[in-house]
Amino acid sequence: MKKMNLILVAFCLLIQSCANDEGNYDYIDINEVEFGNINEEYNVMTNSTILEIDPTLTMTEGVSPDSDRFAYEWVCVASNGTKYTLATTRSINTIVSLPLGNYTLYLKVKDKVTDLQWTTSTYLTVGTIYTKGILLIGENEEGNAEAQMLSMVEDTKLISNILKNSGLPTLKGPINFIHTGTPYSSSYDVAVKVWVMTESGSYWLDRESMQGTIENHVSKILYTSLVPTEDLRIVDVAPQIINSRGSVGSNFYRAMVTSNGLVFSTSMGTNKDNYLDPVNRLSATSNDILHAFPFIFYPLKSYYGPVWYDTKNDRFMRATTSSTYSYTLVDNPNDPFPWNQGTTGRKLVYGENTYNKDGGKNSGNSFALMKDQQGEYFIYKMYAYGSRPEKIGAYQINLDIATNFSDATMYAFSSLRTVLFYVANNKLYAYDYDPGNEKLYQFDLFGSSEITMLKFDTQINPDANALYIATYDTASKGKLVRYVVNADPNIVTLTDDADNSWDGLIKVKNFSWRPQK
């Protein structure tokens, strides 16, 4: 107890002495640094591009930043922590020779008089000319499948003859050219692929060089004894990229559908990008495979297994991410349409996944265009979540308003409007299917040029409601233009984006976004 009292007294005396201390200190101003003229990010091509940064440094003491008093160091730090020193000068002007990837670039300034150090940072992406941009697939003048890229690593540059120079055999019937998205972690990097999909074969290319071989055929990642795999061709992959960074609706699961109606599903955590038996059957032991329409329905922002269409029995089916087979779907009272279309006589014509949020479905609704035996057309809107799909709405197309709809060969659903664009007899139409307010708009924008592609952007800037339209004529070759659909619900207009218009292209059939990974 006596010991505790002594401690308490000592503590009180200490507090009092601190309170009475009015100080007798000498304060010295120190030099401070303010950085400027450094961008938020830089993109370079390895062993090619000069990285040039000339920062401004304002010193509070008025000292010149070029004085011998200061030491400089530019350090790149990779995502795994590896460090690379690029320069030891205030400004940097050098060709970057780093492994491909994303880095944090630090500028460190040390005052050799005071030993104080200041640091600022920016982001550096090191890639090849193929690192980022728009992937195009279509036909060349000989009618063969060909691919191009609008590289956007620095200034936009058109790269042609990608397939011709890839090492792959000559291909026919272009379908798609896609990047599967940025991996969740480096352990998933093996599952990241650039796919070339054509009617004569599906192959993946090296992401850095765009080179491929016949050994990169889809059959090399399929492990099933139920069907021969040598001639299989991919026509759709889910999930796909949902933003310019390369994010996808799931980093752990993926599905593919082939041209002959097989649906494969995998867990990349377990199998990487390898696939076992097709899941479009009714039990894990069944050898009876149901033919699937060549499209996978799913919410763009949240993939949890495929919803697919059984063309043999005309019904929508589902499989979860862990399924080895598929499930039939049960209707609820007052549903806008039945999952089983066998009783309606309707068949699936076209499917599309969008960012439509009707019904509170923020991950995105899907659309199915149906046709019955009498030639009538219907739009089904659904939330195609693999474990729990929901129906959102159904609309019959008024063919008295939708001119030449039965002749349509291309379709595109707006995410933000009740509007279906279509091309019939080389004319572009927009049909507003809002019940009771149906309207039709025709756009004469392309003269005699052939319309070769119609597709909404769901990858680069989905919120813009941008429609990409490709055309072709023998004189000026292929052209791709980005149009923005207006928001006014009373009218449909298209505004062309002069900064996003490219010509001298192949006959474009499809496009997608290539992110930086």
Annotate each predicted stretch with a short phrase.
Residues 2-9:
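Sec-dependent signal peptide recognition
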Residues 14-17:
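C-terminal motif of bacterial Sec signal peptides marking the signal peptidase cleavage site
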Residues 19-162, 166, 459-464, 472-517:
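Acidic/polar, low-complexity intrinsically disordered N-terminal segments immediately downstream
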Residues 131-132, 191-192, 251-253, 363-366, ...:
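Short coil/turn segments that connect the beta-strands within blades of beta-propeller domains
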Residues 135-140, 197-200, 257-260, 369-372, ...:
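Recurrent small/Gly-Pro-centered beta-turn motifs in extracellular repeat architectures
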Residues 147, 177-178, 186, 408-413, ...:
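Hydrophobic core register within WD40 beta-propeller blades
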Residues 157, 162-166, 178, 182, ...:
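Preference for solvent-exposed, low-hydrophobicity sequence contexts
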Residues 374-478:
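Intrinsically disordered, low-complexity segments enriched in Gly and acidic/Ser/Thr residues
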